[in-house]
Amino acid sequence: MHHQWLLLAACFWVIFMFMVASKFITLTFKDPDGYSAKQEFVFLTTMPEAEKLRGEKHFPEVPKPTGKMLSDSRPDQPPVYLERLELIRNTCKEEALRNLSHTEVSKFVLDRIFVCDKHKILFCQTPKVGNTQWKKVLIVLNGAFSSIEEIPENVVHDHEKNGLPRLSSFSKIGIQKRLKTYFKFFIVRDPFERLISAFKDKFVHNPRFEPWYRHEIAPGIIRKYRKNRTETRGIQFEDFVRYLGDPNRRWLDLQFGDHIIHWVTYVELCAPCEIKYSVVGHHETLEADAPYILKEAGIDHLVSYPTIPPGITMYNRTKVEQYFLGISKRDIRRLYARFEGDFKLFGYQKPDFLLN
């Protein structure tokens, strides 16, 4: 009996020592600095296959721009700009919106970002949101022209002549350095109003005489999404809405190429959850935001934003209602489902007057 007790005690001792050793091993190999949560920028299409960063789902580290950095401690900092950045940070953390708020920092994104090395500025292009005027500002800053008035309209979007390099043209190290240290900004507007502007500009008026929108893209959308196949009218906004709200539109997007930049989401264009922007301007308050951005970038003494015609940046609910009139609630809800991330990231009110 005495031997049985000794044997039992020995077994308990072995088990106890094993548990202590396991705990010690766990503590020894635990990552003390939390490197498992270290954030990285993802470059999938610009780097060789072996250099792709796989599986990263974390948020980027806070960069340290060489220009003026937004800070909660600055007494002269208008709270609206801090609130916008805080809203983006909080929305990026919402797991339910991850598929609508996150994207890889791919070549498509890097192609949208224009570089001014002289003044350490990055500008992410968001078409139909005063993008042309901001490109003119950067063209002057880069030294291609001495004033905005001298820039020919046909040069602004000619990237072989306007002197604006894209971020994608730099090495991986050069890209990362600029993303971490430069002043970065982009402009947004109400997502649905932007889609209306894109439709009017590319399929109705087409002031730059870009025939591929009417002759190639429009017919492709009509063939796929028009309900009444006997109707011979050109593309209608209803066709456009069905295309944009279709979860299976990807094959058409691939055919349309980079022309889709005029209507894809801000998330797809600028990756706001992956890149820590210094300022996000709003088209609706551009009269105040443009001078503020120039000041924060440290260039307000060098260039001015072109004069903004009165009322042109105001949100026009009546126009939005008119364009969506007659479009089914199902199609509008599908459209909102795609752009919900943009609405929530940038604080735009859900358009219940269209959805309900």
From Swiss-Prot:
The keyword Transmembrane applies. InterPro entries: Carb_sulfotrans_8-10, Sulfotransferase. PANTHER family: CARBOHYDRATE SULFOTRANSFERASE, CARBOHYDRATE SULFOTRANSFERASE 10. It is found in: Golgi apparatus membrane. This is Carbohydrate sulfotransferase 10. Its main location: Golgi. Glycans are attached at N99, N228, N316. Residues 1-6 are cytoplasmic. The chain crosses the membrane at residues 7-27. It comes from Mus musculus (Mouse). The lineage of its organism: Eukaryota, Metazoa, Chordata, Craniata, Vertebrata.
